[in-house]
Amino acid sequence: MGVRHPPCSHRLLAVCALVSLATAALLGHILLHDFLLVPRELSGSSPVLEETHPAHQQGASRPGPRDAQAHPGRPRAVPTQCDVPPNSRFDCAPDKAITQEQCEARGCCYIPAKQGLQGAQMGQPWCFFPPSYPSYKLENLSSSEMGYTATLTRTTPTFFPKDILTLRLDVMMETENRLHFTIKDPANRRYEVPLETPHVHSRAPSPLYSVEFSEEPFGVIVRRQLDGRVLLNTTVAPLFFADQFLQLSTSLPSQYITGLAEHLSPLMLSTSWTRITLWNRDLAPTPGANLYGSHPFYLALEDGGSAHGVFLLNSNAMDVVLQPSPALSWRSTGGILDVYIFLGPEPKSVVQQYLDVVGYPFMPPYWGLGFHLCRWGYSSTAITRQVVENMTRAHFPLDVQWNDLDYMDSRRDFTFNKDGFRDFPAMVQELHQGGRRYMMIVDPAISSSGPAGSYRPYDEGLRRGVFITNETGQPLIGKVWPGSTAFPDFTNPTALAWWEDMVAEFHDQVPFDGMWIDMNEPSNFIRGSEDGCPNNELENPPYVPGVVGGTLQAATICASSHQFLSTHYNLHNLYGLTEAIASHRALVKARGTRPFVISRSTFAGHGRYAGHWTGDVWSSWEQLASSVPEILQFNLLGVPLVGADVCGFLGNTSEELCVRWTQLGAFYPFMRNHNSLLSLPQEPYSFSEPAQQAMRKALTLRYALLPHLYTLFHQAHVAGETVARPLFLEFPKDSSTWTVDHQLLWGEALLITPVLQAGKAEVTGYFPLGTWYDLQTVPVEALGSLPPPPAAPREPAIHSEGQWVTLPAPLDTINVHLRAGYIIPLQGPGLTTTESRQQPMALAVALTKGGEARGELFWDDGESLEVLERGAYTQVIFLARNNTIVNELVRVTSEGAGLQLQKVTVLGVATAPQQVLSNGVPVSNFTYSPDTKVLDICVSLLMGEQFLVSWC
């Protein structure tokens, strides 16, 4: 095959011509090098849905040769072309099982596999492409303002209908670390994901990558400039671009790949013939199944610890196939190929570069980081009030009380029943008076079965034309909790205004604080609609990904139903995201404060508007353990506000399981205990006193750490950082961290090692190079209103060379370690964040061997909008060096200026100090333990004023 380097700029055309002639004489094809250096001009943008006009629909008829169904002249593969290593074989029968004769009629090779890989989901293909299989040819490659353009032509049709034989390639060198290319039909506008991405006006002058093109068969090769490593090579298999089947394959530089959520799987995906299906579905987390969200982004680790990422901006139903060579194939059922490559080179940078495209996470209100409690079955305000009272009596923190469907009248949105919930508004007001917040479930499906004039949300929605329609132009009617239902089209601007009105009107009755949006894949209890679905190409595409149920209509609405921007075939995976955007905006309008939305269904960019909970998990040890990689995965995808239902949702928990889940859940960024209708009670107060004490201890620790957690969310919001993160993100050069997914970090500083198995009193975790201090030697409980747990002997520090360590983990303990070199702020825990925010604060200072450490505190009123734009916040940097701790005041306002610092705990003080000074004044109230090397200093300082604490 011929490989082309990008062409020259016009300024150097003459030089290039000489080079070209000489090279052509030797090689028979042209090699051109690009020397274009143009200053980069970027205009920032917010990744929000555009209001665009409908595009060409997949499945529509096309005139001319693209409709060709016969494939005359397709060459048969000869035996020598079929000598392809088994792990490098790309499937020539992705659509169905075929015979040898049918395979060879496609021009492909047929060799039955001797034995599949153990544990493989699919197995190697028997029918596979030979290297000579016809693909597209690159023509008219030229330089552009942003990079390169070219035409791609195919002369031989594929075995899928409606091949698009002429394509346009646009390569955009957007930034030094981001390459973007699209492949689309130049003659007909096709559906593109309506997610606004950054607008760039000129190519990057000094990219970290180089781009090469294979002429025939066409392919793109992307290398890392530093070492020449190939990050993307699409020449490994032929390109397909038919109306309803697009396939792009690439080699991978290693088998260590993560992303492509949402699935129940380890953090690192298996490359042993694994198929990952992206088509959002209401299904309790099950291995190998398509679940609630679709995120077509992966991060790949490379030898030495570098990393890169690839994002296919495509929302159609798709499969992603991983194979052992290693390689990956994208198989989409529509749209265009819109590909971003992020160069990193650090894994952390890859995540930030991805979020530069899809959007940084929203900043949650402070109360949203407290403990949330819910269950399906709180069937009255009396029962709900009793739950809150029981939590208070048992001295458990509780910030947000929730209700499931029970509050509704006939399970209809924006209503409450006048039996058990007749005093619903008063109950919510009482929660507010106690410093708590309230949330309830809101499903997207709107009841359509009542008589006209009986249910305003449907009547008004029908009048405004906000619902998804069927082929007759009438609202598509499915079945969900209230019975017959219509589905709002959140891509319709009219529907956004209608949703805002419905939210505001209900908020006028019941002053709720946040929205729990469920069933928004969208879920449907029947297949398609009450009238079925049409028999057309959108309902029966030539390629159906590996969806549970076997059809695109399974557990959802008809793919051919109509929305404002396009068909549901194209927009299905965006339904949860568009509802999250609508709910985010509606809460801002109704409440005038920071919105808090938790959604089940997600797509790329979701974290900018809402959080996520991982759905209907079972109360099992297996799903407890699986929650860790799930939480880590969503943080890598820019959705840091994520958690699983503590103690599990389906089935009955056990006391031990619920204790261990509460301990882990205390370190979910979003913590909610939620339970199913028929399951045994699992509120913390439902268990024995020893179990309650263990849970109380975990919740106490979470509340003490909330200032640090809030600061991490601020860093995520402004800089694209993760909150909970896998070890490899901080220690990428240590390959032992790459597969660790039963531990997690909070930011850079805290390492959490939970117990995830039954009957265990110890746990083994990996500790990267450095010193790790046991955080539970820091006694902060005395600062707040919660009783301190009983003291237990602890190993004060682990000095690791990068090793596995076995730790004691009795039932009342979760191991949390503070990394040397970091300072974290803590606060006295209360029963609510309203209470805890009034408590004095402490600093935990973890010194390196050189005696240094650094930390940060971000503080505002916890719920106002635009605090950064208005400067209504306090930000403080803490530094330790030479036996001295100081604070640097980045910004101080009334919010945070009066925060009291009452204690400084210094970990790793080698020798007993003779004197401690606070702002130059001797401190008499300090203690030092020669066994633990911990120095405790009682002070009386203000965070918002400069201070200096020293010892000698």
From Swiss-Prot:
Cysteines joined through disulfide linkages: 82-109, 92-108, 103-127, 533-558, 647-658
Recorded consequence of changing residue 324 to L: In POMPE; uncertain significance
Biological process according to GO: aorta development; cardiac muscle contraction; diaphragm contraction; glucose metabolic process; glycogen catabolic process; glycophagy; heart morphogenesis; locomotory behavior
Effect after changing residue 308 to P: In POMPE; infantile form; severe; complete loss of activity
Reported modifications of this chain: The different forms of acid glucosidase are obtained by proteolytic processing.
Effect of substituting residue 689 to K: In allele GAA*4
Glycosites: 140, 233, 390, 470, 652, 882, 925
Annotated effect of mutating residue 404 to N: In POMPE; severe
Family: Belongs to the glycosyl hydrolase 31 family.
Pathological association: Pompe disease: An autosomal recessive metabolic disorder with a broad clinical spectrum. The severe infantile form presents at birth with massive accumulation of glycogen in muscle, heart and liver. Cardiomyopathy and muscular hypotonia are the cardinal features of this form whose life expectancy is less than two years. The juvenile and adult forms present as limb-girdle muscular dystrophy beginning in the lower limbs. Final outcome depends on respiratory muscle failure.
Protein name from the UniProt record: Lysosomal alpha-glucosidase
Source species: Homo sapiens
